[in-house]
């Protein structure tokens, strides 16, 4: 959670053009923490769903995550309300149900308010994306607090269009 706190506090000012060295240090440290967390705990459904999307349309990984994460968070908050409550608060939100909205507001502040459709994904791609998600991202799916099936993943892709 420290990485999220640091990113929320410092990345918007850097995106706006600040050259503040302490902010750069904080964002760099947050990135390091993120890498250690991924190495130790793995990733969850947003990454699992993003990899097929970036594979089919050569989407930049961060943009794919930006399109998918708020939608997946909205669907997942009931599976880990305390965790999502903490994330929402770190991003300036106040309620568990509002975590997806807090993520959306943060993404807007850093110019990453995107949809999969803006990245070239269409509704016709969803069956392929869904099947490939389950082929290549089983660990990410299993690691996510909300257990999902193909129908749920397809719906989440559709909502992210």
Locate predicted features:
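Active-site segments that bind and position negatively charged phosphate/pyrophosphate groups
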Residues: 1-102
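C-terminal charged capping/lid subdomain of soluble metabolic enzymes
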Residues: 92-161
């Amino acid at each position: 959670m420290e990485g999220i706190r640091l990113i929320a506090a410092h990345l918007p000012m850097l995106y706006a053009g600040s050259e503040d060295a302490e902010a750069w240090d904080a964002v760099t440290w947050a990135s390091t923490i993120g890498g250690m967390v991924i190495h130790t705990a793995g990733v969850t459904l947003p990454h699992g769903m993003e990899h097929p999307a970036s594979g089919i349309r050569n989407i930049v990984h961060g943009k794919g995550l930006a399109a998918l994460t708020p939608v997946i968070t909205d669907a997942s908050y009931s599976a880990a309300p305390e965790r999502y409550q903490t994330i929402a608060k770190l991003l300036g939100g106040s309620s568990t149900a509002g975590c997806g909205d807090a993520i959306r507001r943060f993404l807007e502040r850093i110019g990453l308010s995107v949809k999969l459709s803006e990245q070239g994904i269409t509704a016709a791609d969803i069956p392929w994306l869904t099947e490939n998600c389950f082929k290549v991202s089983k660990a990410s799916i299993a690691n996510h607090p909300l257990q999902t099936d193909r129908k749920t993943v397809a719906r989440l892709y559709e909502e992210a269009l």
